[in-house]
Each structure stands twice: as structure tokens, then as C-alpha cells.
Amino acid sequence: MKTIGYAIVGTGYFGAELGRIMKEEEGARIVAVLDPENGETVAKELGCDVETDLDTLYSREDVDAVIVATPNYLHKEPVVKAAEHGVNVFCEKPIALSYEDCDEMVKSCQEHGVTFMAG
């Protein structure tokens, strides 16, 4: 089975908890997190790297997918940038706070041929 490398953007309660769950899943590996407030702490717990820039994070060869768990109003940038880098996306719900942002995020993922899931 191929191991999928996951990044997590936003390591508050939901992001950190999803990381803990994914760490135990066969075929999944948390490779890096990005969060200016508690990224270092969560990275240490998960045994992964810390990144401070979305472009650097998404340019990593070992990042196949990203979990976006930032505050709801901050979902758009990490989703659109992930799509631009060809990284598949799982985004916490709600996807965004406006129809326009949702539309832009979905269209960006479609345009770049990446999988976009919300939950």
C-alpha cells in the first residue's frame, strides 16, 4: 500500500485531532504542519516537520494532500494555493463564509485537477 503524505494547515483543536487520528491510519503519514501559534508543539507530538510558508509546504515532494483546519474565514488561501501546487485538499466545514469564496475554491481545485473534499 502506498503511503500518502499529509500536511496540516491550522493545528488548533480540529487540526491537531485530525493529525492524531491520521497518524494511526495505515497508509497515512503526517509530514508537516503549518500554524504560527502552536505548530511547533503539535509537530513535536506528531513527529513531523514545521513549515511557515504555504508555498514551501506545498512544494515539498512528500506532501500529497493537505488538511485545512484553519479558522473558517481563513480557508480560501490555503485551499487555492494547494490546488495551484497540485496538492489534494480536505477542508473542514464550512468551506467558506461566502458563496464567492466557495466558488473560487471549488473552481481552482477543478481547474488544477485536484481532489477537493469537505467534512
Residue ranges of predicted features:
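Rossmann-fold dehydrogenase core element
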Residues: 104-119
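Short, Asp-centered acidic motifs that coordinate Mg2+ and/or phosphate
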Residues: 29-32, 64-65, 88, 115
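Short helix-capping segments at alpha-helix termini
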Residues: 25-27, 85, 110-114
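Conserved hydrophobic packing residues within short motifs/helices of P-loop NTPase cores
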Residues: 7-9, 90, 117
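Beta-loop-alpha module in the N-terminal Rossmann-like domain of NAD(P)-dependent dehydrogenases
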Residues: 48-108
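Small/polar loops that bind or transfer phosphate-bearing groups
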Residues: 10, 67-70, 119
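N-terminal Rossmann-like dinucleotide-binding module
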Residues: 1-45
